[in-house]
């Protein structure tokens, strides 16, 4: 992090040739050439400059300009599975299972090295907003959490069953499952830019889904086999694709602090698929011809961008 210094990355966009070539007043070829040479000859982070900046700030009783930190995700998970299998007769087999999973995910940034500095400010240097109003204007150092801190609680319960039928030339199966998934964000920091929507527990987000699968295989002979499968599934979106910016607020996709946006709440993903296979065997080789169709609805993906 570089709250008190310039971006130390040699690949910072304002130091690359493309930045000068995209100048609104026309391409700056001289600047682009100089940037290219600097990148070729000095393409590594200048650690000496970073340490010098922090040591200079120490002498002036200022906070460090640079620190090294890591984004941490510490998960604690409990999983319970139960399975049941029974052979009704030589032609019919039944499988069933029940599953429970509980996840507590602790997410935070932690300073791992002060890079010669003594202290660091837990303030966003871009807009001068506090990262944690619960401890305003705090000073942090190595081993301290800063920038963001929240926990994500997730719980999933599911039931699954499948029945298989097997005869001389014909095999087929039918399977189904139901699943309930819940997410809840618990903010440890109160981000000033999201005050009132950052600390504490947010709303519990719940998803109910089900799935149905079926398939049939017909063996004309040991050399020629036809196989068909179909499925319709509903599944909860991932945690990442449910919350728009979980590091700093409780907002979920399709809503903000004021409620729903365009009356479009986030919902389960719907997946429909079919496939058909023809398998043939000869003494020389084995081949397979496959055709398939898949359709996904109500899926979403969170992306981020930087605006200068």
Model-based region annotation:
Residues 77, 301-306:
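Short acidic-glycine motifs
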Residues 77-78, 157, 271-272:
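Conserved glycosyltransferase catalytic-site signature
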Residues 87, 226-228:
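N-terminal presequences and immediately downstream first alpha-helices
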